[in-house]
Every structure is written in structure tokens, then in C-alpha cells.
Amino acid sequence: MGKRLTDCITSQYIGAANRLGSKSARRRIVAYVESYDDIFFWRSILTRFENEERYFEVLLPSRLEHLERGKKAAIMSMIATGGVGRNMIACVDADYDYVAQGATYSSKTILDNPYIFHSYAYAIENMQCYAPSLHNVCVAVTLNDAQKFDFEAFLADFSTAIFPLFVWNVWSYRNATERRFTISDFIRSIEMGTISPENASAAIAQLRRRVAHKVKMLQSQHPGAKESYLSVKNSLRELGIMPSETYLYIQGHHLFDKVVVPLMKKVCNTLVRERERDISRQSVHATQQRNELSCYTSSVGSVEYSLRRNVGYVASEQYRRIVGDLERFLNDTSDAITSTQNHNPSPSST
């Protein structure tokens, strides 16, 4: 089957198209992302770099007769064939590629290629669950600013509790062993079941006991791993991964669906009921009460939707690192383009 033109597009192709435009036209840089959910996240970052000289177009990669998502499929294929470059970049979730530090093919490819940008955190779901921003999300959902639950303290406790097991998980990916402790094994080990603001402290205490038990099992299975375990632990700290922020580096879907959303729904339900009681108490008559309650109910948002659109991560260190990577890329490519133009003067200047 013949290839479509869109399957042959590379950075060089985009660069050639840019040169065909007028000198005053802005340079187009295509940014390929993994899924629909990633489009808003990367667009919110790339927008700050657009000016009179350049603009970004965020796209999903198309392959053959269908759309493939995930960097292990279309994006990794595009990278392997040399598609990325100054005019075409890939923006991906880090998954474990950042913490693996080149121990796998995927990790080495993503960390070594200057045209691939990653989230540092495991996925954008982790960034959307950035702890200092979660109270503001509750306010956006409920229009009630009362603080009923300390998300920052909870996620710090959760992170500290699972950190020893997280180190073992990363150790397993950096060190090929016969008994691999997989991400799935790790996630099963930190499952918290039904969680609510009322039982959060007890759930954390139980989690600590379960983690300690699993750590002892792993230590018995790998009695000679103490030195390499400590080396991985120190390496993670050098990468800026603190025990209290482990939640940013675990599987994003688990954090989002099993930890943050269930908690936030319960907190928001409490805030909504509180606001409804306030309206009922302050209403002068039944008609006013019905009108006010109807107006308020129609203004209450969705927890999942509000989290998906949460941009509070702009205050995070991970966001600052992404911005720094993009700044270096744009500075380097701008210098390269200027150098090329200086070495290829127009006919009128010769």
C-alpha cells in the first residue's frame, strides 16, 4: 500500500515549507503529542513561546489508515525514522523514562534526543493533580472557598509512605533481574481502596504497614541489592525527586482515578451541601430559595473536567524544567537559523 503524504512529513519537510513562504511569514513548528488529552497541556506551555517570528501547531501523529496513540507506537516510529528536528518536535509523557535514566531503549531515546520534550512527572494527570492547586480546583467546582481537606499534607504523607517501594520499582527497571518488580506490582502494592477525608489518616497508616511488608519481601528476594538500592535512592534525589513529591512520578491514571478524584468528589460534595444549606438559611421565602438553589446548582462544575483543565502546575518545578528545555531548544534553533541565513545571503546582497 502506498504511503500518504502526511505519513512522509518530517522536520525537513516543514522547514522546506517554511522557506517557501514570504520572509515576513512566521516559522511553523509542529509539535506532535500522544493523545487528545495532551493537546491542551502542551498548547498551554507552547503558547508562551509564540511571537511574530514563530508559532506552534499541536497535532496527533497519523499512521496508515488509523490514528495510533502513545509514544511506543506512532511517535517512537516517527523518532526512529528521523522525523523530528528543528521544525518538528515530539512532546510526550515521561512515564518511567525520566527516572530510568537511559536504562531502557525508550528512556535513552527520549532523554538523548534534543527534539523530544517530556513532562518530567509520569504523565499530565500527575501535573493536573499538583497538590498546591487542588484547593483552587475545589473552589472552581463548588464556588465555595472553605478548606475542608488538606490535599497538600495528604499527598505529602501518601508520597512519603510509598517512596521506599517506589525506589524498589525504579531499581527493578534500572537493574535487569529475574524477579522483576513491575509498575503493575507497585500499583497493586499501594492500592488504598475506598478513601475519604474521614479515613485518610487511617488509610495512610495502613499503607505504610503494607509498604513496609512489601519492602521486607523485596529485601529478602534481593539480599545483595542494598548498595544498588541506595545508589538509586540517591540518584532520584539528585534528579529532584523528593520523597514528599513521589505522587508526581507514579502511574498517572492511578493517581488521578483512584486517589485524587475520589477524595475530591467527597470534599466537593461536602462543600456543595454546605453552600446549599447557607442558601436555604439565608433565603427570605421559598421562591427565592428555589431560584438561588437552581442558579447555584447550574453553576456547580464537574470534578473530572475541572481537574483536566487545571493549570495550577505552572507553579511546579516540573513545569519550570519543561519551559527551560523549550527555551534552550528555541535559542539553539534560532542561532542555527540565523547562522544559515548569514551564510546564504540573498542575491541582492551579493
Language model regions located:
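Acidic, divalent-metal-binding catalytic cores of TOPRIM
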Residues: 1-350
